[in-house]
């Protein structure tokens, strides 16, 4: 028996079946680094229109977690897809390097500044620590396959960036947005510092809730207001609070102007409450016998005075819109030094912003004899006892509620009025302009717009000062007596910035005021405060984007971070850019959800459900992680677990197998010599290229819309359905058995080549390592890297005007599906083994019949059977299977007649008809020894 195997064009490629990504990727990365791939891309894209995705700086502390990976991979997919779309899209990664978490780490090791080390040495240790953290995170980000200028990232602690942060503040001062004031800010007594809103978390806490009576100073005036005379005992206005410790700072009682307030007679006294809350208050304080003597609107009680229960002064009733009927009494204890609403209304009424609490959370001397020096959280019981002693306590109970806590210490924080510096939201129209700018930005998903609008509309002035050691100094001089800023503040700040640019922030603390103030130095003091770390990152549009040469003066097109950054980086960047330049720092803002486990639970070390990106990369490879990110809808929570990653690995295998099939069947194909012109190609091959063209249109549209899960779904459909279960199956016969250099085979290879050129580019932004690997095996002259090129433009398709157009092949796909069902049933019934053992008769109505007949003898190749006949629908025998999909089709199956050809495996009547090749069929004889078969359609 002759060996005809050598006459077959069997697939062959060095591209491995298994990805072995965890082992192979590091080698690819080494090559990317050695070649300076990022530099090669920049050179290739020079002069193209720019797309700038500005990196929100992660905090330089700790290892990267799965959320970091999601963020960096999404950014990388966008940057790479923009590159393929013809943009120059430089990516400069950054890190946030100042701030409290780093200080705390250094404190843990070396003690607080001034203990073992001077403040200057402490800052040097902080800088050193941040640098080691940056190095650790950088290695992991690079391992993810993220391309960027990793050798020259921006760090907020770079001397030049520190100087530019000071300049940004100078510009804001110049535009009139800064003011100083004693104002209640979130204050952590453990940090001994003000906290930004983004540094506050909420946890459940048990507090004492109390109802307290403030007795009226002028009882007769109140009786007159309520038009009553028969009141038994003193009249009091009752407040309700969950922070008894703030009562020493009480300076007023807020009531709502439009609510009805009732004068209620109870045993031995009368109390004033919101009418709608009388019943609930009476239940709470345990009073069943009460009488409503009269009612008035809150506005009637404005400026009547009430005696503080133990502080020895009286306070006014004032009108406030923040009073609600949700809980309490309808009268709100108001301490302007301990709450933002209280502060705002206090300013309106000219109240003192009293703050009796020191930075460590204890009452200052002279507050009240039994409270001086006591920690406020331990003072509640003392205050309650005082109220009881004075007869002012109506009720006390414990209640569980959500309470603001320090994000770092997880301990409760307080509002505390301190002298701070603020960026004003309203004194120069910053709020109004910011709201206007928001409307000009594209928010992805679009609900982000309403979210940030509501935050900007309702946010207080931004407290930008901190009392910390490791941070950018505010670099201000204030007059010793008046505390006014120096008249030459902007000039002085630029002088400081120049020094910081050379020596870093330490230059400010080393600066002797005489050096730049001369004789005025005796009248001015240096402001010791540092800037809120959110000011550092929020000013990078100016301190980084505006000055990096690769951005060439272009503003950022996109900011992309987790959805918590509406209140964080997106907000601080918007505030600073609008205050400096009058415009938003970005054109598009994309947010992604948080990662959760397979059951939708938040990731937590204590539950043990965290997924380590390092582990995933070491076991499965970065491309699997990247594919999971891309295939997950980032607009909601992003679920990840071993099972979910396993599914991503399965999808990856399907894509890889498709790529491998293409490469293996391009064996011996040289596009420069072997390409077949479209008009000479087999129709099915042109259809396949057209499928790729349609897929590319969908995929590019999805990349453009940042719908990466759509990209993956379309890619999978193309690989699994259009190629895997139809086209690639059909062409195996022609590809393997036709003459090696025949038009029939070269047509097929031409299609595979076009498809591979397109596919490798679709993959590149997501499966970057695998695309690079595929690229290396593609035939023909090409650039060294897929990332320097653009989307493939060599695709074409069938014209609608052709008889065998896309609609024709869509119908054929359905026919093939129906035939497959019949074959599967026959296999289950043991009537046939493989599909080539079958011959089918298609009983079709005239329109479909004409289409099927048009394929002639090539219909069997489309159906993967050894025989295929078309007959009249009405002639179908009773056992023919009626199609559920195509009403005008019935399918009958019989065993194929003839012998099996050992070369092509088809059953035919002409095996052995040619004496020189007695074992094979006539078609194979033609392909081995003759001119080769001609294929026109399939």
Curated annotation (Swiss-Prot):
ATP binds at residue 605. Transmembrane segments: none annotated. The modification N6-acetyllysine is found at residue 183. Its EC number is 6.1.1.5. Its cofactor is Zn(2+). GO terms for cellular component: cytosol. InterPro entries: aa-tRNA-synth_I_CS, aa-tRNA-synth_Ia, Anticodon_Ile_BEm, Ile-tRNA-ligase, Ile-tRNA-ligase_type1, Ile-tRNA_ligase, M/V/L/I-tRNA-synth_anticd-bd, Rossmann-like_a/b/a_fold. L-isoleucyl-5'-AMP binds at residue 561. A motif ('HIGH' region) lies at residues 58-68. It catalyses: tRNA(Ile) + L-isoleucine + ATP = L-isoleucyl-tRNA(Ile) + AMP + diphosphate. Keywords: Acetylation, Aminoacyl-tRNA synthetase, ATP-binding, Cytoplasm, Ligase, Metal-binding, Nucleotide-binding, Protein biosynthesis, Zinc. One of its GO terms (biological process) is isoleucyl-tRNA aminoacylation. Zn(2+) binds at residues 901, 904, 921, 924. SUPFAM superfamilies: Anticodon-binding domain of a subclass of class I aminoacyl-tRNA synthetases, Nucleotidylyl transferase, ValRS/IleRS/LeuRS editing domain. Binds 1 zinc ion per subunit. It is found in: Cytoplasm. GO terms for molecular function: aminoacyl-tRNA deacylase activity; ATP binding; isoleucine-tRNA ligase activity; tRNA binding; zinc ion binding. PANTHER family: ISOLEUCINE--TRNA LIGASE, MITOCHONDRIAL, SOLEUCYL-TRNA SYNTHETASE. IleRS has two distinct active sites: one for aminoacylation and one for editing. The misactivated valine is translocated from the active site to the editing site, which sterically excludes the correctly activated isoleucine. The single editing site contains two valyl binding pockets, one specific for each substrate (Val-AMP or Val-tRNA(Ile)). Catalyzes the attachment of isoleucine to tRNA(Ile). As IleRS can inadvertently accommodate and process structurally similar amino acids such as valine, to avoid such errors it has two additional distinct tRNA(Ile)-dependent editing activities. One activity is designated as 'pretransfer' editing and involves the hydrolysis of activated Val-AMP. The other activity is designated 'posttransfer' editing and involves deacylation of mischarged Val-tRNA(Ile). Monomer. Belongs to the class-I aminoacyl-tRNA synthetase family. IleS type 1 subfamily. This is Isoleucine--tRNA ligase. The gene is ileS.
